[in-house]
Amino acid sequence: MSGDFFFGVFLFLLLRWLALLFNLLAFPRLRPRPTPPKPTASLLVPARNEAENLKRTLPALLRQGALEVLVLGGLAEDGTAQAALEAAGNPPACRLLRGAPPPPGWTGKNWACFQLAQEARGEVLVFTDADVLWEEGALGGLLE
């Protein structure tokens, strides 16, 4: 191999190195955007005759990190309210609402959801049924 070949390779590598050095010094660095705060969420559960489901669902809901978990189960006939209290263990983030009978023209679940929405304090209202099992971090993914 001739000296011209090695000189050409050396010159090529030198130019590539200088281009890399120029790019490192001349191009601006991108800064990560500050992440906006996540909105507060209220998990709302209209429950009627859902005592067995609440025993499984409520602990998973409480682990989601919501501002509050509201359960409306006042008109149930199977001890839904008592099951909710036992499953929750009475944490401050969980409230049980008794509810009122629906006025004329309202159906049961619509009226229950309306009452829950009136009591909720979160910026985002997330309605869920008592038989839905939430995976860890599901609420965080929903709010992103």
What do the PLM-derived regions correspond to, one by one?
Residues 40-42, 68:
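Cell-envelope/extracellular polymer assembly enzymes that use nucleotide-activated donors
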